[in-house]
């Protein structure tokens, strides 16, 4: 099983379509590489590093996200582009914040929270 299959199965099991953390519908068979322009193709998804490999937040100097399955999540291509390498912000009308769950040396595993109707929830739970 390759990485994209592992990530999809970890979050969605055997489903062939799902909704990402920002409420965008994605389809298992529409995985795309991050470098492909897919802005006009509905339902495409890619793998996001929850805690980015190279965070754009100055408060986390010397910390980088890991490639562990626990630091990866499926996001629609557009959601992933909007989230970028930020640890908090807004995608569409959903506010998000990344929390550090585990750190081994300088490699970090993160988990994302989303704010819906004024309340914070762990994404995908």
Regions found by a protein language model. Name each.
Residues 1-46, 76:
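Short cysteine-rich loop/turn motifs with clustered Cys
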């Amino acid at each position: 099983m390759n990485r994209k299959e592992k990530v999809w199965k970890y979050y969605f099991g055997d489903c062939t379509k799902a909704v990402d953390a920002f409420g965008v519908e994605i389809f298992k068979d529409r995985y795309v590489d991050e470098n492909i322009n897919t802005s006009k193709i509905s339902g495409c998804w890619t793998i996001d590093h929850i805690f980015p490999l190279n965070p754009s937040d100055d408060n986390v100097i010397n910390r980088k996200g890991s490639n562990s399955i626990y630091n990866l999540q499926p996001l629609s291509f557009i959601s992933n582009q909007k989230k970028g390498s930020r640890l908090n912000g807004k995608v569409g009308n959903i506010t998000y914040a990344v929390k550090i769950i585990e750190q081994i040396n300088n490699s970090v595993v993160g988990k994302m929270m989303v704010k819906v109707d004024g309340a914070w929830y762990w994404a995908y739970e």
